[in-house]
């Protein structure tokens, strides 16, 4: 845990309470209205199928897939900034809402995981960069269900947080020009714990990943997102096999969701080259 990261969480709480912040250049950036909309629009979906039958097709053409070594927020900003060039929705206050959604590799039982305590995983980084944490507090039932459960397979529920303000960069600096993105919060199965506590169920992990990834993509499609930021979901402390996670998404994007999304970025910010390479092989 990092004292500096705890301080950022504390500063973010002050920014939210104040309804905005002042940049280094002296510009006042308002966040209150955008955050109120995001909190009011936060919903829990699942665990059952969300879109019955076929998924409505996109605007035509194959989905472009990238595998990169950037963070989820850097990838999201890049997709938001280029959305207008491709006919997508624009970034900050477009009436239809942002065109980009980011998968949050979530803790099933604690909003933001260890964000308030200064932890360093992907969910915590997203919460430091944005107002995501505030929207997760709007979904207490999601966490109650998982706290009541014993198995670390968790459930196929997804929290959708629309139009969340993103206002810090990867260094923790406040942005001169924030942007908005949707967030899809879903925990991967905790493969490490399953292998220790329920080894007889290890063979169920691939199906659980595939089913849960399908729920994530259904929520994205339901809300009309055209650009997604995914990644090495559950491949850190949850110890899922990167090749297995990559294959779950590959099969869905080539199958039921073929052509539904314009662009999908797998942002794999991992010290181990093998993790990113697993996704590069899957989408070669």
Predicted regions and their residues:
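Macrodomain-like recognition of ADP-ribose-binding/processing modules
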Residues: 1-228, 232-284
